[in-house]
């Protein structure tokens, strides 16, 4: 596992965006051989999307031959709802870059057959071979995507019941009323994430410190689903200073020295 210790949210977003652009450009994608990118929603990746759009507008990257798969979507929320992840992705990213509509893959939380929708999503991912890079965030309780505590580490795309903690955390997008946050969501599984060639998790804020500590220094534990990344061959945690507050000083020092060349000139 790599840990990229940065100062603030802006640096986290800038580093993540540059990393994605470098990976896409090094891959040299074509229509027949697209780069497959996994994407999250929420507050944490907002800076990354802002910088990705800026890099696209600067002519440093094209998304024409990039295929995307999003992590999750609420069940029962209309697609056009301002807080649907469909709306979020189009407002913050897709509508500002040159990605073709047919290359965008989002879970349908209003599908008539939810189980079939989840199977279809998994099959679509497999049809591309694998996801080359999956960017994600982490919840205060260590969940990745909507794989809440006690999720199977072998799980695939499925419907999940959201915890009260998650609904409370997401209530800030629903006028502060947790009762307006849907109770269920479709999400890629932990196993789906682990199948990706590379996983990059963005961690920002003091509230995520315990989750980061569990991921980096704790044992592999389904109560902290983020800890599954210890099993991944190419996992990267990109974090700001407040989120490292629960890590041992020597842990932060170790990774700061190890990644010194990769975090300068931000």
From Swiss-Prot:
Specify the signal sequence span. Answer: none
Q: State the oligomer form and interacting partners.
A: Homohexamer.
Which class of enzymes does this protein belong to? hydrolase
Keyword terms? Allosteric enzyme, Carbohydrate metabolism, Hydrolase
Q: Which gene encodes it?
A: nagB
- Family, similarity comment: Belongs to the glucosamine/galactosamine-6-phosphate isomerase family. NagB subfamily.
Q: Which SUPFAM superfamilies match?
A: NagB/RpiA/CoA transferase-like (SSF100950)
Protein's pathway: Amino-sugar metabolism; N-acetylneuraminate degradation; D-fructose 6-phosphate from N-acetylneuraminate: step 5/5
Function recorded in the entry: Catalyzes the reversible isomerization-deamination of glucosamine 6-phosphate (GlcN6P) to form fructose 6-phosphate (Fru6P) and ammonium ion.
List the active-site residues: 72, 141, 143, 148
Query: Which Pfam families does the annotation name?
Result: Glucosamine_iso
Report what the protein is called: Glucosamine-6-phosphate deaminase
Q: What is the lineage of its organism?
A: Bacteria, Pseudomonadati, Pseudomonadota, Gammaproteobacteria, Enterobacterales
NCBIfam families from the xrefs?
nagB, PRK00443.1-5
- What controls its activity? Allosterically activated by N-acetylglucosamine 6-phosphate (GlcNAc6P).
Keyword Translocase assigned to the entry: answer is: no
Q: Which reaction does it catalyse?
A: alpha-D-glucosamine 6-phosphate + H2O = beta-D-fructose 6-phosphate + NH4(+)
Q: Name one GO cellular component term.
A: cytoplasm
Q: What is its EC number?
A: 3.5.99.6
GO MF annotation, one: glucosamine-6-phosphate deaminase activity
Q: A biological process (GO) annotation for this entry?
A: N-acetylneuraminate catabolic process
């Amino acid at each position: 596992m790599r840990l990229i210790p940065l100062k603030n949210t802006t640096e986290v977003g800038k580093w993540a965006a540059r990393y994605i652009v470098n990976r896409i450009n090094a891959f040299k994608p074509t229509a027949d051989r697209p780069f497959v990118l996994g994407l999250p929603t929420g507050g944490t990746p907002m800076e990354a999307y802002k910088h990705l759009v800026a890099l696209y507008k600067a002519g440093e990257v094209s998304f024409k031959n990039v295929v995307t798969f999003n992590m999750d979507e609420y069940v029962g929320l209309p697609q056009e709802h301002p807080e649907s992840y469909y709306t979020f992705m189009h407002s913050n990213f897709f509508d500002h870059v040159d990605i073709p509509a047919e290359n965008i893959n989002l879970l349908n939380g209003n599908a008539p057959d939810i189980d079939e929708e989840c199977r279809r999503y998994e099959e679509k991912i497999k049809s591309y071979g694998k996801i080359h890079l999956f960017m994600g965030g982490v919840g205060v309780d260590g969940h990745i995507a909507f794989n809440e505590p006690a999720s199977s580490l072998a799980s695939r795309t499925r419907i999940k019941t959201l915890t009260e903690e998650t609904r409370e955390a997401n209530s800030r997008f629903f006028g502060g009323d947790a009762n307006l946050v849907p109770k269920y969501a479709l999400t890629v599984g932990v196993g789906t994430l682990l199948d990706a060639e590379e996983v990059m998790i963005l961690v920002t804020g003091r509230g995520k410190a315990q989750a980061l500590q569990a991921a980096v220094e704790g044992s592999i534990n389904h109560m902290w689903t983020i800890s599954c990344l210890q099993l991944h061959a190419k996992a990267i945690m990109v974090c700001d200073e407040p989120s490292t507050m629960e890590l041992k000083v020597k842990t932060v020092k170790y990774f700061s020295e190890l990644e010194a060349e990769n975090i300068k000139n931000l």
